[in-house]
Amino acid sequence: MSTDLAQSWLTLSAPVAAARAAGRPLVALESTIIAHGMPYPENVRTAHEVEALILELGAEPATIALIDGRIRVGLSDDELERLGRSGKAHKVSRRDLPAVLTSGELGATTVAGTMICAALAGIEVFVTGGIGGVHRGAQETFDISADLQELARTSVAVVCAGAKSILDIGLTLEYLETQGVPVLTCEQENFAAFYKRDSGFRADYRLDDPAEQARFIRTKWDLGLAGGVLLSTPVPEAAAMASEEIDALTQQALDEAQAQGITGKAVTPFLLARIKALTGGRSLATNIALVKHNAEVGARLALALAQAARGAVA
């Protein structure tokens, strides 16, 4: 499919279209976190607060979802509310885009799905909570998130709080290395682990300055090296959960999922909801804090990338 034909599926909101026309930096946001990652009304409230943070820093937020047979880039208040309340939105990764677009049903984009749509819309930076990855026990199940393949093929910089701690983070990083995806960190040397700050695994490069991050990313793409760059930043210390506690609760939730025969796309929403229940809601507060922090890091990166692009033109 030609790029023009693919872009014909896009509907940009007025603010996103105006920002793109003016050359203002854009930050893509996923919708799975709204539809499946948090309960209502915290999901919609957090979405509004994250968008406001990005705007305050000088970039334009572009939350992405599939609505009525269109890829919507930038959502209205009513569309955010619809996503947050629905409970029936499909999780949309690469394989699901054709099905949900042709059916016209409501679709919430995953990391992979959002990367594809962001690239079509010309957006270079995407902020999420945590990426998917290699699931524990993948040696037997082959349960590996499509997010990792998308990072290898789609040229979007992804800002996250590491990989979700329910995953095998060591194998996730090994997979990314095999696929040639650079893993950057800021604020610390080690890759983050979602609810907790430190996964115990060292990342490829630490770059704290947004201008340095932008130069790294721009150089990769200038060399014709297609694919994304992953930038990990830890959850703020005040909101982080203790490693021993979250590890034990994660294992308990995983055991429950296995006992109940929960597999595939249903695993992550089940685990997040179960951990929220087991922590009395504290994990949700941590999730909200890390997404907001990621949004700040992502907005600054988008500004730096835009400035670097202007400098190259000059």
Curated annotation (Swiss-Prot):
GO CC entries: cytoplasm
Nuclease recorded as keyword: no
GO molecular function: hydrolase activity, acting on glycosyl bonds; metal ion binding; pseudouridylate synthase activity
Assigned EC number: 4.2.1.70
Keywords associated with the record: Glycosidase, Hydrolase, Lyase, Manganese, Metal-binding
GO biological process, one term: nucleobase catabolic process
Cofactor note: Binds 1 Mn(2+) ion per subunit.
Active site residues of this protein: 30, 164
Binding positions for substrate per the UniProt entry: 91, 111, 145-147
Keyword Transmembrane helix in annotation: no
Cofactor: Mn(2+)
Reactions mediated catalytically: D-ribose 5-phosphate + uracil = psi-UMP + H2O
Positions contributing to Mn(2+) binding: 143
Gene3D superfamilies in the record: Indigoidine synthase domain (3.40.1790.10)
Quaternary data: Homotrimer.
Protein family according to the UniProt entry: Belongs to the pseudouridine-5'-phosphate glycosidase family.
Biological function: Catalyzes the reversible cleavage of pseudouridine 5'-phosphate (PsiMP) to ribose 5-phosphate and uracil. Functions biologically in the cleavage direction, as part of a pseudouridine degradation pathway.
Protein name per Swiss-Prot or TrEMBL: Pseudouridine-5'-phosphate glycosidase
Organism: Cupriavidus pinatubonensis (strain JMP 134 / LMG 1197)
